[in-house]
């Protein structure tokens, strides 16, 4: 679950440091992962991805984060860094990114980037500007949709997901953005091949990541706890809102 990934900065504690600290009071080892991956797991367990073996989760928020579910499992890669779609380079964009690179998707499609390009202070002002027909705001949103579609198209060529699940404040503020993203994504796919990739909204609220984290923490010694949503000997669990972690776990068994 990302435990092999190390940041190059000394500003963050290592897993060893965190383990020593937490074991002063608790027995189990800590499990470290990011909010986007836990939100993707929640969607796989109880949300929009509950009947899908493979999907890409993308969150457009203060940053741009991604996660891949393939064959009913979260994909972490060799060091837990797989799915960093927000830091794929887009076209001729040369804007500096907080990660240290230039031209990342995050510099076009995150809330701060969109607000900066549109000349507004926050997402509320951005929505008002777009709805009022402000050219600068609309251009910024269109540029973001095209960039997101480009990145998702490239990712789709690699893993052939059943769907793209998009989440975050930007999608909440502009529901029609999903169709713009889908159109841009399909332009990147091979036209002579038959593709069936839906771009859908996330169905769980902001507590989804916390619920999935609790689910994982309750199963620290189960190797398959990170499996997305394929119960042993059965079909994927039913879709629906994660109103209760305990109720869902009782109904569906372990993933």
Functional labels for PLM-detected ranges:
Residues 52-108:
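Glycine-rich phosphate-binding loop of actin/hexokinase-like ATP-binding domains
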Residues 34-55:
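Conserved phosphate-binding catalytic cores of ATP/NTP-utilizing and phosphoryl-transfer enzymes
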Residues 1-13, 163, 168-170:
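Short beta-strand-loop/turn "lid" adjacent to the catalytic site in phosphate-handling enzymes
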Residues 34, 60, 168-169:
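Short secondary-structure boundary segments
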């Amino acid at each position: 679950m990302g435990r092999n990934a190390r940041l190059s900065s000394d500003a963050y504690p290592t897993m060893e440091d965190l383990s020593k600290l937490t074991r002063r009071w608790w027995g189990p080892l800590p499990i470290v992962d990011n909010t986007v991956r836990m939100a993707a797991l929640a969607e796989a367990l109880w949300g929009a991805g509950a009947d899908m073996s493979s999907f890409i989760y993308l969150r457009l928020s203060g940053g741009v984060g991604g996660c891949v579910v393939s064959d009913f499992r979260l994909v972490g890669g060799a060091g837990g860094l797989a799915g960093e779609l927000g830091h794929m380079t887009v076209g001729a964009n040369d804007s500096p990114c907080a990660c240290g690179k230039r031209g990342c998707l995050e510099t076009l499609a995150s809330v701060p980037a969109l607000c900066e390009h549109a000349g507004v202070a926050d997402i509320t002002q951005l929505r008002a500007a777009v709805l009022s027909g402000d050219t600068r705001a609309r251009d910024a949103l269109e540029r973001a949709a095209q960039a997101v579609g480009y990145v998702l198209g490239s990712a789709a060529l690699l893993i052939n997901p059943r769907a793209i699940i998009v989440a975050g404040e930007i999608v909440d503020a502009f529901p029609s953005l999903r169709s713009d993203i889908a159109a841009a994504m399909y332009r990147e796919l091979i036209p002579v091949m038959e593709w069936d990739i839906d771009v859908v909204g996330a169905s769980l609220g902001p507590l989804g990541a916390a619920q999935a984290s609790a689910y994982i923490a309750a199963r620290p010694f189960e190797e398959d706890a990170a499996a997305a949503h394929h119960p042993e000997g059965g079909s994927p669990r039913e879709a629906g809102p994660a109103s209760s972690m305990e109720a869902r776990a009782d109904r569906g068994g372990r993933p």
